[in-house]
């Protein structure tokens, strides 16, 4: 069976950490920001981890 190709869109959105966990950016931080609190925008800047149920599919998409 041939190797899986990396999903290039997923590769740009997710990063696999050294521990094996997958990080992602939060949504709702690209436009229409004037009505959002500074506190909310600050929290949206932080990275978060992919949920455990989604991790296997993401890991498969970004497989090297």
From Swiss-Prot:
GO cellular component: cytosolic large ribosomal subunit
SUPFAM superfamilies: L35p-like (SSF143034)
Keyword vocabulary terms for this entry: Ribonucleoprotein, Ribosomal protein
GO terms for MF: structural constituent of ribosome
GO biological process: translation
Highest taxon listed in the record's lineage: Bacteria
Record's compositionally biased regions (Basic residues): 10-44
Annotated region described as Disordered, given as residue ranges: 1-44
Family: Belongs to the bacterial ribosomal protein bL35 family.
PANTHER family from the UniProt entry: 54S RIBOSOMAL PROTEIN BL35M, LARGE RIBOSOMAL SUBUNIT PROTEIN BL35M
Stated name of the protein: Large ribosomal subunit protein bL35
